[in-house]
C-alpha cells in the first residue's frame, strides 16, 4: 500500500509539474525556502519529474547558514547545465548569484550557448539578483487553438541541439559560478525579435563556432524584448520555406514583433536567381510580415574573409547585398547593412588579425581535429560578438524603434576600431566539435 501511495504521489507531482509554466528552484542543500523546489548537487535530470542537472559530476552544495534561499548555493569547477521541461514560449528567468561568505564570478547562457549574462562578479558576502528573458521553442507548428498543423523538417545534426529538445537548458559557467536560486515565469507581453538566416546567424551549439545571433540577446533589456533565433546552417530563403521554418514563425509572430531576415551566402551558391528567386521571396516575406502586423528588418550578409593585394575586402557575394538594399528601398523597410559594416571591421583588423575573428585554429585545438581549421566564412565567439555589436550599432545609429530596448551592455562601437580580443571574455562550454557547419 505504501509503495502504491508513493507511486501515485510521484505520478501526480510529475503530471502537475508538466502542466506548470512558473517554477521556483532553490539551489543548494535540502534547506529550502517555502514554495521552492530543492535542487542539490545530486539533482540529476529526470524525465519523470521534468528538471535537474545534465551532469552532476563536479557539483558541490555549499550551505553558509542564514537565509534559506540565499544562504546556500550550487557551484562547480566546470560548466554545469540545469534543464527544465517547459512549454514553448517567452519566459523571464530571475537568478540569484553570489556567496554570503565569499566572492563569485558567473557567466550565464541558455540553450545553444545563447549569451545572457557575462562575467557577473560579486564581492565577498554579496548576493545579486539578475533577470534574463528567454525564448523556448519546439519544432511543432500549431494553429491559434494550439492544434498541431505541421512540423519543421529538422536536419539530422539538429536533433542534438539543445534548442529543439523540449527543454529549457541554462548554462552556468566561468571561474567560480555560484547559484542560489532560479525562478522561471512566463512573459506574454515582451516584443519578440524573430531571426531568420544561415550559419552566420544561427545559435551554434559547438565551440569554436559562433554567430552574431547568439550574442544578440546580451544587448537587450530583459522583460521588454525576447530574441527568438530560428536560423539554421546551410539554409537559403527557399530551404527555409521548404523545411517549414518560416511557417512556424508565421504561426507565432504577433503584431509589433520583429522579423530579421539575413540570407545570401547559400542563396548565391544554390544558383538562385536574384530576380526570380531571391528578390521575389524577400518581397513575399516582407508582405506577409506586414500583413500580420510585424516589422520586417533586412540584414545584408556579412563579407567573407577574402582580401585583395591592397588588403581590401573582396566582394564574394555577387549582387546579393545590393539586391537586398534595393528591396529595402522599394518596400520601405528597415535595413541593417552588415555587409558594409563587416567590410569596415575586417579591413580594420587586417588580413592576419582578422583570422582571430574567424575559425582559424592549429590542429588538435579541439577534440577530433587532426588538421588545422581555416574557415573564411564562419566566426568564432569573438568575431560573432563584434558582428552583433555592428547590428546593434546600426539599430542605435538609425534610431530604429528597437533602440529604446538596447541595454547598458552596449556602450558604443566603431567598426574602424575593433575591440581588443585580449579583453574579450568567453569561458568555453563543454560542447566542442571540429566539424564545419553546413553552408559556406
Regions found by a protein language model. Give the residues of each.
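Short catalytic helix/loop segments, enriched in acidic residues and glycine
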Residues: 45-53, 209-222
Amino acid at each position: 500500500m505504501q509503495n502504491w501511495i508513493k507511486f501515485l504521489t510521484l505520478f501526480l507531482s510529475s503530471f502537475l509539474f508538466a502542466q506548470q509554466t512558473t517554477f521556483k528552484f532553490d539551489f543548494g542543500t535540502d534547506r529550502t525556502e517555502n514554495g521552492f523546489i530543492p535542487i542539490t548537487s545530486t539533482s540529476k535530470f529526470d524525465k519523470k519529474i521534468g528538471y535537474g542537472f545534465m551532469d552532476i559530476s563536479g557539483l558541490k552544495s555549499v550551505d553558509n547558514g542564514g537565509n534559506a534561499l540565499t544562504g546556500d548555493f550550487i557551484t562547480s569547477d566546470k560548466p554545469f547545465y540545469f534543464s527544465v521541461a517547459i512549454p514553448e514560449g517567452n519566459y523571464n528567468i530571475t537568478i540569484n548569484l553570489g556567496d554570503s561568505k565569499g566572492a563569485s564570478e558567473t557567466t550565464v547562457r541558455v540553450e545553444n550557448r545563447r549569451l545572457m549574462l557575462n562575467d557577473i562578479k560579486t564581492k565577498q558576502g554579496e548576493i545579486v539578483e539578475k533577470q534574463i528573458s528567454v525564448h523556448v521553442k519546439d519544432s511543432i507548428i500549431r494553429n491559434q487553438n494550439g492544434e498541431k498543423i505541421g512540423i519543421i523538417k529538422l536536419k539530422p545534426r539538429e536533433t542534438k541541439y539543445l534548442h529543439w529538445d523540449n527543454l529549457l537548458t541554462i548554462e552556468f559557467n566561468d571561474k567560480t559560478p555560484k547559484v542560489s536560486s532560479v525562478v522561471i515565469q512566463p512573459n506574454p507581453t515582451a516584443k519578440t525579435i524573430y531571426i531568420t538566416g544561415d550559419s552566420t546567424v544561427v545559435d551554434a551549439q559547438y565551440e569554436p563556432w559562433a554567430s552574431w545571433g547568439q550574442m544578440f540577446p546580451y544587448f537587450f533589456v530583459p522583460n521588454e524584448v525576447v530574441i527568438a533565433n530560428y536560423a539554421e546552417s546551410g539554409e537559403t530563403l527557399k530551404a527555409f520555406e521548404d523545411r517549414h521554418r518560416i511557417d512556424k514563425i508565421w504561426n507565432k509572430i504577433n503584431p509589433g514583433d520583429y522579423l530579421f531576415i539575413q540570407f545570401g551566402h547559400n542563396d548565391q551558391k544554390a544558383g538562385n536567381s536574384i530576380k526570380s528567386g531571391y528578390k521575389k521571396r524577400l518581397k513575399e516575406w516582407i508582405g506577409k510580415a506586414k500583413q500580420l502586423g510585424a516589422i520586417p528588418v533586412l540584414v545584408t550578409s556579412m563579407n567573407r574573409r577574402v582580401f585583395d593585394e591592397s588588403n581590401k575586402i573582396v566582394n564574394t557575394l555577387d549582387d546579393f547585398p545590393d539586391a537586398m538594399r534595393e528591396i529595402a528601398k522599394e518596400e520601405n523597410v528597415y535595413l541593417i547593412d552588415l555587409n558594409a559594416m563587416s567590410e569596415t571591421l575586417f579591413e580594420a583588423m587586417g588580413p592576419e588579425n582578422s583570422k582571430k575573428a574567424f575559425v582559424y585554429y592549429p590542429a588538435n585545438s579541439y577534440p577530433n581535429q587532426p588538421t588545422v581549421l581555416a574557415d573564411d566564412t564562419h566566426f568564432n565567439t569573438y568575431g560573432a560578438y563584434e558582428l552583433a555589436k555592428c547590428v546593434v550599432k546600426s539599430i542605435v545609429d538609425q534610431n530604429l524603434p528597437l533602440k529604446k530596448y538596447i541595454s547598458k551592455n552596449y556602450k558604443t562601437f566603431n567598426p574602424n576600431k575593433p575591440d581588443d580580443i585580449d579583453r574579450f571574455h568567453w569561458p568555453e562550454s563543454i560542447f566542442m566539435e571540429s566539424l564545419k557547419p553546413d553552408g559556406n
